[in-house]
């Protein structure tokens, strides 16, 4: 039975939704770990979010998913022992911004990170798990350049029916239009939309759709991707928060948009993948497995 005395607590790394994260040292092995401490309310017991994260994470063993080694349950706190990662994608991108203009990562690195992101997502989806909160802050990177999915605080194994999910998922900028319009029957496609937003952000060095509220978020999406109609997305007008007053924006040239933010040449193959991930109609979005088979990743096949 592991106890917290096996670990030496080092500096605090951050505060999550319901936990504080510390860097720790395993005194037995000499390896660094991340210690996620969840304070327990004596009345309430263990938060259900933490229980959900634990049961999911212990099953998920994949090189692109942060490994949960152990769970230590004491009277007033729960300590989750994760593998230690040096950085996250958000901090990594921020540290490399060209001060002249917002510029993203080199395209070879973008491709390598996106491949790893999709590998992790595909593994989740094969195991009937939605991540539901993919964003650069939740993609952890070590000094070997490995990228891994972390923070499954909102993840939930999905089954049938799937129309009971709460709409409180995914940070606004990475939130799919179907979720923003109140769809309650979403599935793996919500993670795919987030993957598309992250891919664009790695190239551009800034968020593709940086909205401040649901309405503005949808407006930004439609201004770029075009306003959906019943012709392009059957059932869109039946969604609870569909607004028939929204202007009919034409779709913009994504290639031009991306090219304006980088000195490297944006290929049609890359644009094609982004368009496949950022389909407004969730049923038209690529699956993670289809995205991994995309010609952009030919060298990895």
From Swiss-Prot:
Family note: Belongs to the protein kinase superfamily. CMGC Ser/Thr protein kinase family. CDC2/CDKX subfamily.
Catalytic activity line of the entry: L-seryl-[protein] + ATP = O-phospho-L-seryl-[protein] + ADP + H(+); L-threonyl-[protein] + ATP = O-phospho-L-threonyl-[protein] + ADP + H(+)
SUPFAM superfamilies: Protein kinase-like (PK-like)
Protein name: Negative regulator of the PHO system
Record: residues binding ATP: 13-21, 36
Keyword Kinase annotated: yes
Oligomer status and interactors: Interacts with a number of cyclins.
GO BP field: DNA damage response; G1/S transition of mitotic cell cycle; lipid homeostasis; negative regulation of calcium-mediated signaling; negative regulation of glycogen biosynthetic process; negative regulation of macroautophagy; negative regulation of phosphate metabolic process; negative regulation of transcription by RNA polymerase II
UniProt GO MF annotations: ATP binding; cyclin-dependent protein serine/threonine kinase activity; protein serine kinase activity
Biological role: When phosphate concentrations are high it phosphorylates the PHO4 transcription factor thus establishing repression.
Uppermost EC category: transferase
Keyword list, A-Z: ATP-binding, Kinase, Nucleotide-binding, Serine/threonine-protein kinase, Transferase
Catalytic-site annotation from UniProt: 133
Family annotation (InterPro entries): CDK (IPR050108), Kinase-like_dom_sf (IPR011009), Prot_kinase_dom (IPR000719), Protein_kinase_ATP_BS (IPR017441), Ser/Thr_kinase_AS (IPR008271)
Domain spans labelled Protein kinase: 7-297
EC number: 2.7.11.22
GO CC, one annotated term: Pho85-Pho80 CDK-cyclin complex
């Amino acid at each position: 039975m592991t106890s917290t005395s096996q670990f030496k607590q080092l500096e605090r790394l951050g505060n999550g939704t319901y936990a504080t994260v510390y860097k720790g040292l395993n005194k037995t092995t000499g390896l660094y770990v991340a210690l996620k401490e969840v304070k327990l309310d004596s009345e309430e017991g263990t938060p259900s979010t933490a229980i959900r994260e634990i049961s999911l994470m212990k099953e998920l063993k994949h090189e692109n998913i942060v490994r949960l080694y152990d769970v230590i349950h004491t009277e007033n706190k729960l300590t989750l022992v994760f593998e230690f990662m040096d950085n996250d994608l958000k901090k990594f991108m921020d540290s490399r911004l060209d001060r002249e203009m917002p510029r993203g990562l080199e395209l070879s690195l973008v491709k390598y990170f996106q491949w790893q992101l999709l590998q992790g997502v595909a593994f989740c989806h094969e195991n009937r798990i939605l991540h539901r909160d993919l964003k650069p802050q939740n993609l952890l990177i070590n000094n070997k350049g490995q990228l891994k999915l972390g923070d499954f605080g909102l993840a939930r194994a999905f089954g049938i029916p799937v129309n009971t999910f709460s709409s409180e998922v995914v940070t606004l900028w990475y939130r799919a239009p179907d979720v923003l319009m109140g769809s309650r029957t979403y599935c793996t496609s919500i993670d795919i939309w987030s993957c598309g937003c992250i891919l664009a952000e790695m190239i551009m060095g800034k968020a593709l759709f940086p909205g401040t509220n649901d309405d503005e978020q949808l407006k930004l999406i439609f201004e770029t991707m075009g306003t959906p109609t019943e012709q392009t997305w059957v059932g869109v007008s039946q969604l609870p928060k569909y607004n028939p007053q929204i202007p009919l924006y034409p779709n913009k040239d994504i290639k031009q948009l991306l090219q304006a933010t980088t000195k490297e040449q944006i290929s049609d193959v890359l644009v094609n993948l982004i368009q496949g991930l950022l389909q407004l109609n969730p049923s038209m979005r690529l699956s993670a497995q289809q995205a991994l088979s995309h010609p952009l990743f030919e060298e990895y096949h």
